Amino acid sequence: MAVIKFQMQQQQHSNWCWAAVAVSVARHFDPDSTWCQCRLASRMAKREKLNVAGCGTCRKPTGVPKKCNQPWYLQKALRMVKMLKGKPKGAPLSYRKTRQLIKAGRPVCARILWGRGPDAHFVAITGCFKTKSGERWVDVEDPDSGSSTWLHEEFRKNYEYAQGQWVDTYPV
């Protein structure tokens, strides 16, 4: 059994799974990190030239302009918080590789594509174990729906039983 002590933040707005995952990863490796979802979203809005003054503050994450509630790239968000460690892989990881990373204390950040797309969602895998019968399970931290445990193959192909497919992996 391999498990990381990891605290996933609840996403503060409907499209901020990318912000919640990136900030949670930053705080996992540096508990004193000053990153928060609003600060990261403000940086995103400035970079994407959304013409907004800001996306709230760390102390007041509600009441942000609607333009701030945007889907965005986890790769860019992880790079902004200085947590991206290499090039993302356009595929899921094997159970063995997932376990290896978790044993090394590294959460596995994944992009889930819903059905045939284009909607996607970001989560982190923070644990894995194998039963006596050989079933391989993973613990998933989801900034929208919370913690859950999935058979590795089921998570790869049918997350949330909604045709959610693990399509990209981000090294942190």
Q: What residue spans do the PLM features occupy?
A:
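Active-site nucleophile-adjacent alpha helix/oxyanion-hole segment immediately C-terminal to the catalytic cysteine
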Residues: 1-51
